[in-house]
Structure formats: structure tokens, C-alpha cells
Amino acid sequence: MHIDQKVIDEINSKPFTLASRKGVVGLDGFVDKIVAPVEKRHGLGDQFDAVSTIAEMGAKISAAAGKSANIELFPRFEKLGGNGPIMANAMLALGMEIRYIGALGSPMINPVFEEFASKTKAVSLCEPGITTALEFKDGKLMLGNTLSLENIDFATILEKCGEGEFIDLIAHAD
């Protein structure tokens, strides 16, 4: 694709900043738990062979039909997840002032959201959802638990945020 140099020059001549802009973002929040399914153990901790592919995992699950199976999931790390927090972080990176209202933990903010909640002066509505992401060489299989998000409604937003503060946040957002 060819882009005319005049267009490139005009775009480059325009300052791009969102530093003077304010936004309100919500409403979800997920703790992403990244795990490796264990194929064979060789010792404690991370001494194991992981299930390599989604097809191999599918075969293990299919082989358990009519029986039972226990597949160990080795925890690799946890991180912030959810469409709202990811979008809010992107807007923060562009210099916007962001307030976040969403599922970050209750009564305490979940540790994966502490820095984010501080940067956004977040109002947490409920516990976050949980995504357990099984990582393979050929992709991820994400298993989501969204039950806690069923607690999010307008009445809860007003209760946790305060009606006056919520109206003020919305009124002053760009």
C-alpha cells in the first residue's frame, strides 16, 4: 500500500496528545492465570514436560470420556486482563486521565490490579472474573469464569461510586 508523502507530512505536522483529555472506562476486569498443562512429571516445581499442542490436549480429554481424568495445570504467572482494563491502560499510555469503574476485587482490590487501580483512582464493583489460559505451542485455550460479573448493574455502580460522583465523572469525560 502506498501512502502519499503529503498525507504523511500532514499527519507528522499535527501534534498528537491526549494529555488534556479525561475518560471513564469500565466495566469488566479479569485475572488472567497463565498455566501449562502437565504431560509428564520429572520432579517438583517446573520439572515436567508440558502438553505441547491443543490437539494433544484434546486427545487427552477425549480419552477420558466415560471415565475420569486429572490433568495438572502448572501456574506460570498471573496478569491483569479484561477488555476494560486493557483499553484503559492503552489510554493511560497515550496520556489521558482515566477513571476506571469495574470488577477489580471486593472488598479489597485484587493484587494484579493494585497499580492500575492507583493510576485510575478506580472504583471496584465486585470480584474480577477469572480466565485460566492453557498455553500450548500452537495457541491458547482460555477457560473463563464470569460469575462475579453478574453483580454489575447500574444500581451497584451508583452504590459503589456514589450517584453524584458518577454523574460528575461522566459529565467531565471527553
Question: What spans do the regions from the language model cover?
Answer:
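Glycine-rich phosphate/adenosyl-contacting loop at the front of the ribokinase-like
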Residues: 1-99, 108-111, 131-133, 143, ...
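Glycine-rich phosphate/diphosphate-binding loops that line cofactor/substrate pockets in enzymes
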Residues: 14-19, 166-174
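Glycine-centered loop/turn motif at secondary-structure junctions
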Residues: 95, 116-117, 138
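Charged interaction/catalytic cores of defense and host-pathogen modules
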Residues: 105-107, 166
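Active-site-proximal loop->helix
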Residues: 107-123
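Conserved phosphate-binding/catalytic loop of the ribokinase/pfkB sugar-kinase fold
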Residues: 123-172
